Amino acid sequence: MKVLESLSNQHKTGLIPDFAWVKDGTVTPAKKDQVAGANDGNYGANSCRLPWRLANSNDKAANQVLSKMMNFFLEESTITEGYTLAGKPLSSNKSENFSAPILYAAKKKEAYGNLVDSQSWVIQNGLSEDDYYGDTLTTLVTLQMNQK
C-alpha cells in the first residue's frame, strides 16, 4: 500500500501508472516502453482497474488513494481511455475498461453520485462483444454491484 500511496502523492490527480519501479525505497513511474508499451508510465489499461480494486478495501490508506483519484474523475466532463499522471487525456474515446471500475467505486460512496450517473452508460449499453477486456471488467463490476 505504501507504494500506491507514494505514487498517488506524486501528482495532484492521484492517478497511478500502469507500471512503476521501486529502488532503494524510491518509487518512480516506469517510462514509455520500459515494460509493456507506450503507456507504461501513464494511467492506462493496467491501472484502470485500481478504482474497482481499491473500493473493495476497508484500509484507510487505500481509501485515501481512491478518494484522490475519484476526486480527479469528478472534475472530468468525460472519462476517457487513459491519462497522463498529470491528468491529460490520452484519447477522446470512452472505454468500458476505464468507466466500469470508476462506476463500481462511485457506487460505494454517495459523494460520487455524479460519476454513477455519468458512467452508467457502461451497463445501459450492454456488452460490446468485441472488447474482451472491457466486457470482462463490466461483467465483473456488474456482478459485484448486484451482490447483497
Language-model regions: role of each:
Residues M1-A100, K107-E110, Y132:
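Extended ligand-binding clefts on enzyme/binding-domain cores
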